[in-house]
Design a protein with these regions (language model features):
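Short beta-strand-to-loop transition segments that serve as allosteric relay/switch motifs
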Residues: 297-305
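Switch/coupling subdomain of P-loop NTPase systems
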Residues: 308-309
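Acidic, Ser/Thr/Gly/Pro-rich low-complexity segments that form flexible
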Residues: 285-286
Length: 309
């Protein structure tokens, strides 16, 4: 059987650069843990500054059955005068069986003691908690921090954990936070937690609450805003890809807004102005007729259409 599985780890705002540096490893680390638990299957990973999300459209309710092979001492060591030696008896004890169940197999050019154990798969719900715990603690964002009385550390404090296997909440405690059927939407939409009845409902709740969960949709929205601003104002926005990745990582509801600064600053070399805008304000420089002008574009995370103030 299969069910959808949603894993959401809610955090205080993640810094963009450490997140982007670890981004290439996040999915691989999770996949490796699934494979180790005989539960590897397709999944999608999403992120916003306030959440890390794993989504399985289909996740097995039971581990695959597996086999374990055990190899012991060569037969000439395992038996003496037709009787099992302490080496053979120790091997059987290690395998949890009597000598009657022990066979032999070729290994390294010798006939050695051999035992093959059939292992029944466990229910997935019993493993999900450890999988999530191992995955989160494997992530390396560089610097980390402690909070409260915890001895463990993470890049930012974890504020909620939401793990839904179908309509069932999976009991997990991560960094002192217990899982619950709730999430948080955009702060301007609702500062309080919002209940979630099932995994599939999650995406509808976020969308209604002003959160664009998918990074590729945030990118598309920003670029569409850029095109509109360029057409309306006869300008050209310099779209730096690294800066674009950063603003995608720090917004849940991005809107590009055109601003301006005092023309006096244009007396400075353009390189100085552009570097300052990009590195210190996360602004996108604006050009007209090939020249830098006293305008910039900032990507806002505000849930509003009124940027007049």
């Amino acid at each position: 059987m299969i069910k959808p599985l949603l894993i959401e780890i809610g955090v205080e705002e993640l810094p963009a650069i450490p997140l982007l540096k670890e981004l290439k490893n996040i999915e691989k680390k999770y996949a490796d843990i699934l494979e180790k638990n005989s539960l590897l299957c397709e999944f999608e990973f999403y992120y916003t500054p306030r959440r890390l999300v794993i989504w399985h459209r289909e996740f097995k309710t039971q581990q695959d059955d597996s086999t374990e092979e055990f190899f012991g001492a060569p037969l000439e060591v395992a038996y003496k005068d037709g009787k099992a030696t302490p080496a053979a008896e120790g091997f059987a004890k290690k395998c949890g069986v009597t000598m009657d169940a022990i066979g032999s197999a070729q290994k390294g050019g010798k006939e050695v003691l051999y035992y093959k154990k059939e292992v029944a798969g466990k229910p997935s719900i019993e493993l999900i908690g450890d999988i999530v715990d191992t995955w989160i603690k494997s992530l390396d964002f560089g610097k980390s921090m402690r909070w409260g009385s915890l001895s463990e550390s993470f890049i930012r404090p974890i504020r909620w954990v939401n793990i839904l296997f179908g309509d069932e909440s999976v009991d997990v405690e991560l960094f002192g936070v217990k899982s619950a059927k709730k999430t948080f939407v955009h702060r301007i939409s609702n500062f309080n937690s919002v209940s979630i009845n099932g995994a599939k409902e999650y995406f509808e709740v976020l969308k209604a609450g002003g959160v664009t969960l998918f990074p590729e949709l945030r990118r598309e929205s920003i670029l569409n805003n850029f095109s509109l601003l360029e057409k309306e104002n006869g300008i050209k926005i310099e779209c730096d890809e690294d800066l674009l990745d950063e603003v995608i990582a720090i917004t849940e509801h991005p809107t590009a807004v055109l601003g301006s600064f005092d023309e006096e600053f244009l007396k400075l070399p353009p390189e100085v102005i552009i570097t300052s805008m990009k590195e210190h304000q996360r602004y996108f420089p604006v050009f007209k007729d090939g020249k830098l002008i006293n305008k910039f574009v900032v990507v806002s995370n505000a849930l509003t259409d009124d940027f007049s103030k």
